[in-house]
């Protein structure tokens, strides 16, 4: 894990950074960059929801099914009993929330990369603060890329956990009209809060998001850095490659965390008044394994992997194109 790669977006900033001479100018450049990261991440998150919601609804229905079922059966029953628009049940909350979550993921990831850039430079006693932007401290070991993504995942979990729980509970409602337990996102929030369950599933979310996003950003940044190593600037990398890199990164994320995501979904969909699974990762794992074996941890795996490529390809491509539109070199 000692191999180093050029930090994407940091290398392409070098020309601009060479022109910065005063502390105020450096602070202004840093603030502008943070705002761009947040805005581009928000738009990327919206694209993620629009592309991925139908896949996600199917996945959650499979994960939380109490009897054995198949993807085709879920799709057939959902369309027959609830209509095509049922694929977008619970979409309002993630549409608003996932944009914020993705902006946090990207924003924290970029902030951590700059932290490690300065930290690595500080270990060189012969390097002045003016040299930092031009030295090999602009490259990071793979382990630091992982920590950057992991930190973004853990921080983001405090937003993602309640948002995902609301979406899961709305997605798994099969009743219509007055028989529904939750009338919508706000009603769901009020009832979860009243039961003290709004943050249920936070710990498994933190583990999943931390390791998952560590892998996610590590894979993507390494692939982009390889392209930069061939002599291209970040803005010269073809959009189709950025989309492909994002798709591959998302696939690797889910390969590493999927069983835990199943456990998390079950905990977050458990009965609020009489929880069956005691809000315990180990209890859920033992219970579902005893009932269905190892296959219980891979319910909905097919739709998730099919979803992963287009969703994450769209997320990273949108982020990169927005950054280019904003004039980020």
From Swiss-Prot:
Gene3D superfamilies: Mitochondrial carrier domain (1.50.40.10)
GO molecular function per UniProt: glycine transmembrane transporter activity; organic acid transmembrane transporter activity
Keyword line: Membrane, Mitochondrion, Mitochondrion inner membrane, Repeat, Transit peptide, Transmembrane, Transmembrane helix, Transport
A GO BP entry: transmembrane transport
Signal peptide start-end: none
Name of one Pfam family that matches: Mito_carr
Disordered as annotated region, ranges: 1-27
GO CC annotation, single: mitochondrial inner membrane
Record's bilayer topology term: Multi-pass membrane protein
Domain of life: Eukaryota
Transit peptide residue numbers: 1-33
SUPFAM superfamilies: Mitochondrial carrier
Record has Repeat as a keyword: yes
Solcar repeats, residue ranges: 34-115, 143-226, 238-325
The UniProt record lists the keyword Chloroplast: no
TM helices/strands, residue ranges: 38-58, 84-104, 140-160, 205-225, 243-263, 297-318
Subcellular location per the Swiss-Prot or TrEMBL entry: Mitochondrion inner membrane
Note: Present with 1050 molecules/cell in log phase SD medium.
Protein family membership: Belongs to the mitochondrial carrier (TC 2.A.29) family.
PANTHER family: CARRIER PROTEIN YMC2, MITOCHONDRIAL-RELATED, MITOCHONDRIAL BASIC AMINO ACIDS TRANSPORTER-RELATED
Protein name in the entry: Carrier protein YMC2, mitochondrial
Highest classification ranks of the organism: Eukaryota, Fungi, Dikarya, Ascomycota, Saccharomycotina
Gene that this sequence comes from: YMC2
């Amino acid at each position: 894990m000692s191999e180093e790669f050029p930090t994407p977006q940091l290398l392409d900033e070098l020309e601009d950074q060479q022109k910065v001479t005063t502390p105020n100018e450096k602070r202004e450049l840093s603030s502008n960059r943070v705002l761009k990261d947040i805005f581009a991440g928000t738009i990327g998150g919206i694209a993620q929801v629009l592309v991925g919601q139908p896949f996600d609804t199917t996945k959650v229905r499979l994960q939380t099914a109490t009897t054995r079922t198949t993807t085709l059966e879920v799709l057939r029953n959902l369309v027959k009993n609830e209509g095509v628009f049922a694929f977008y049940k619970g979409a309002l909350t993630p549409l608003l929330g996932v944009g914020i979550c993705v902006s946090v993921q990207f924003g924290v990831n970029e902030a951590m990369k700059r932290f490690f850039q300065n930290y690595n430079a500080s270990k060189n006693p012969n390097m002045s603060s003016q040299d930092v932007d031009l030295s090999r401290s602009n490259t990071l070991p793979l382990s630091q890329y992982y920590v950057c993504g992991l930190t973004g995942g853990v921080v983001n979990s405090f937003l993602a956990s309640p948002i995902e729980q609301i979406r899961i509970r709305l997605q798994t409602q099969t009743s219509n009209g007055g028989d529904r337990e939750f009338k919508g996102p706000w009603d769901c929030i009020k009832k979860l809060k009243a039961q003290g369950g709004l943050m249920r599933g936070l710990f498994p979310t933190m583990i999943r998001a931390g390791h998952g996003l560590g892998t996610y950003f590590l894979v993507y940044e390494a692939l982009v850095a390889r392209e930069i190593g061939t002599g291209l600037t970040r803005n010269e990398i073809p959009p189709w490659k950025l989309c492909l890199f994002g798709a591959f990164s998302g696939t690797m994320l889910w390969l590493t965390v999927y069983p835990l995501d199943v456990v998390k979904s079950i905990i977050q969909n458990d009965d609020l008044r009489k929880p069956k699974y005691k809000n315990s990762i180990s209890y859920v794992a033992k219970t579902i394994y005893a009932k269905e074996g190892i296959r219980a941890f891979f319910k909905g795996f097919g739709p998730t992997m099919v979803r992963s490529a287009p969703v994450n390809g769209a997320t990273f491509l949108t982020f990169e194109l927005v950054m280019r539109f904003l004039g980020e070199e």
